[in-house]
């Protein structure tokens, strides 16, 4: 189990360091105004930092101290697990989809003039991604179906197995 915890620590710390560096580089870029792709790259670092930080500074210490699910403070576990599994995990792929659409438009329509130049489409898409990524948290609040971190098996699981089964069957 030590090898698994050390590998989780190494990967997550490396992820925090690289993504914080990228965030700082993107945020302090002298090129203004930021392009759409630049904004998306900057924003993509946020869920990456969140995920890696929760693993580095929450999951790894709990696992190192060999805590069990019963000994971990429940509210803290619920909040951090919901941030991780309910917002940060879905947000990453949503931003990647926006990045892919952006690159598709730039590659295949390089000289096309966007009709909606005055509307900040990238900002709206980022906001939409945040709203979509928040849906699992909203659903879990209404269904009392939460994720929790179980340090004894190093994984985030649904707190009640039957609530997940009910969600899948509906």
Language-model segment annotations:
Residues 1-170:
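Seven-transmembrane-like multi-pass membrane architecture, highlighting hydrophobic TM helices
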